[in-house]
């Protein structure tokens, strides 16, 4: 099964990892207060101490030229299976939404916080998608809240925006 590994750090530190590993497909983005790098691979990662996920559904290819929204979806052991089944079975007609580029549904190797990456041409296209029924019915906090379990046992549902780095 394909894995996705992520690490956060300073731009310079993560960029050096990327430069030193030209044979690995490493993707680096800017977030609001940090940089993030990730590697999607069937093999071993070059990242040291990354967060590891199983890729359980994928559409499209990653690109450093696209805008991404990473959605963190908390669950509990009691609700994780149902959450996963719901998200796997979602009709993926959102792929036809203007500016859509890619999608990844990720199962955590440790813990119960799932992650979704939505890739769009730019943030404006993603914000348009967020207003759609497809997003509100399947991916919004309200749509997924009954899979969170009781409060206090998990992290919060949140989004992190990842921007292309312009050099």
UniProtKB/Swiss-Prot annotation:
The keyword Nucleotide-binding does not apply. Each of the three conserved histidine residues contributes to TRAP phosphorylation. Phosphorylation is essential for TRAP activity. Keywords: Membrane, Phosphoprotein, Virulence. The keyword Phosphoprotein applies. It is found in: Membrane. Gene3D superfamilies: 3.30.70.100. InterPro entries: ABM_dom (IPR007138), Dimeric_a/b-barrel (IPR011008), Heme-degrading_MO (IPR050404). Coiled coil: none annotated. The modification Phosphohistidine is found at residues 66, 79, 154. Its main location: membrane. PROSITE patterns: ABM. One of its GO terms (cellular component) is membrane. Residues 67-158 form the ABM domain. Belongs to the TRAP family. Signal transduction protein, which is a major regulator of staphylococcal pathogenesis. Phosphorylated TRAP leads to the activation of agr system and consequent RNAIII synthesis resulting in the expression of several virulence factors. Up-regulates the expression of most toxins and genes known to be necessary for biofilm formation. This is Signal transduction protein TRAP. The gene is traP.
